[in-house]
Amino acid sequence: MEQRLALITLGVTDFKKSAKFYLDGLGWKATEDSSNHIIFIQMNGFRLSLYPHSELAADAAVNEDRSNFRGFTLAYNVSTPAQVDRVLDFAVQAGAKLTKPPQKATWGGYSG
């Protein structure tokens, strides 16, 4: 499997405060596809995103309880749904626990 990450998403408890820190405090720039619901920041070779912790837990199909969900996700992007299935199968074979089966996402992609 190719060593690459496309997106690191941080689940934040205070979205406005976090946005202020990253955008105003650090001076990082939000991309044009950011909104008042999610912020994307282009880094060197990947994107960092800020997303409400409760919604990130729901998207990952896990309980929001911080003892089970630490509040971040890593995205490994591929081109087709079949490739997503293969990557998830590979991860499970390597010992990962699949919490959300691959499916069409509300934002238009395919993820698991």
Q: What role is predicted for each listed range?
A:
Residues M1-A19, G71-Y76:
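N-terminal beta-strand motif that seeds the catalytic metal site of vicinal oxygen chelate
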